[in-house]
Every structure is written in structure tokens, then in C-alpha cells.
Amino acid sequence: MTTDSAARPAAGVTPAAAARWLPYRPMILALFGYLVIRGTVMLNGYLYADDFAFRYWADTFGLTPEYVFRSYYGHVQPFGHLAQWFLQAAFPGSFTALMLWTLLMQVVTFALLWRIVLRLTGSDLAAFLAFLVPAFSMFGFETGVWWCEITETVPYGLFMMISIWALVRALQGDAGRWWLWSGLAFVAAMMSISKGAVGLLVLFMIVAALPIGVPRRRGIIRAFRLAPLYWLVLALLLALSLGGLGLGCVDAAILSEE
């Protein structure tokens, strides 16, 4: 009687569990490699230039609307200010804490990107390439070492990826309130960076131009008719956000002189 030890799962791991984790192995290895490479670069960096303004505000201001919604050269990033304030309160002056927070957010973002592409294409190669380009591009490098840029782009990237993930689930007919979760995540993305309004166009292009859950692309009219309330509510919130940005909670010119 012979046994095939190579096909036998590890002790304590059922065949069902082993099969369930198999599709995630390439993603886990890629994300681990990202952690090692980017973590080495980021943790050997330092704060400079505009970074110190954010550290100073977090250290000297209370957690008030004035602080959370204050603009910096015309840009508003509430989630970035919140993260900076809590990190400064919990780990005063710690550059390591800032970078570990950034790494965690980026790893979750890229894991979601991997899952979205794998779900749509069924190809590990396509998912790996989709992960590779933003993860190791110069833009990805900049948003991983410059804290001033991180406060805006990293939360925005995460919330947009959550919104797209939920949107794909909704388009494929999965049970659940995926349209709602997609909309809420996009609102969070708008609150991460005031320049992120273009994200709504990205969401609409995904629905209109990609044949997700249908044999052929929907086009502009069918994309709108699919979920009119979703688009109208997000467009209204976007208009209110841009209007509030135009009025400005705090004048950027005054802040830049502080």
C-alpha cells in the first residue's frame, strides 16, 4: 500500500481549508515581499519639509473641527489629520509609528486590488501585474515615504479600493447591501483628500465600460439607470463637498503663514 505524502495536507489542516487558502498563496507571498522591500525603505526614511507642519498641528491643536477640516494650500484631508493626531497622541514624535500605519494601510489596499482583479479575470498573473505596477511605481514610492503625501493619498486609495470592491460585488449580484457600502466608502474617500472627486468618474466608468455581471458593456445610459439613486446621492454629496471646499473652513493663505 502506497501513500502520496506530497498531496497530503499538513497536520491539523483539513483538505477543504487547504483548498480554500490555495488561491491566496501568490497574493500572500507578493504582499510579504512588498512588506520587506517597502518596509526597509520606509523605516530608514525621515520627516522633512511640510511633514513638520502636520506634526506641529497635531501636537498643539485639540481634536476640534478647526483642526480636522483645516486646509493646507487649499487641500483638505480630514482622515489624514485624524490619523496624525491619534498617532502623535499615542506615539509622540515616533516616525516608526507613522510608517507602520502607512504600511498597514497600503498592504490592505493592494490586497483588495489583487482580489478585485482575480475575481474579475480569474488570472493570478493579471492580479500580480495589477499589484506590481502601483506597488513599485514611483508614485507608490512617493506616497510611501513622504508623510505629507501619505496623509492624503493612502487613506484615499484604501477607501476607493473598498468602494470599487463593493461595487464589483453589487454588479455581480452578490447578496448584501453592496451599493450602500460602495457609496459610504466613496464618501470616506472624498473626506480623505479634497482632490479625490474624480473617483466618482472612475466608479461610473467601471459600471458603464466594463461587462461586469452582464455579457457586454452597459454604456452610459444603462449604467445610470442601473442605480440612479446611488449616482444622484453621490453627485449631490460631491457637489456639497466641493462647495464647502470653495468656501473653506480656514483660509489656506493664513494657515501657510503659521
What function would you assign to each model-found segment?
Residues 2-258:
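Polytopic membrane enzymes that build or remodel cell-surface glycoconjugates and lipids
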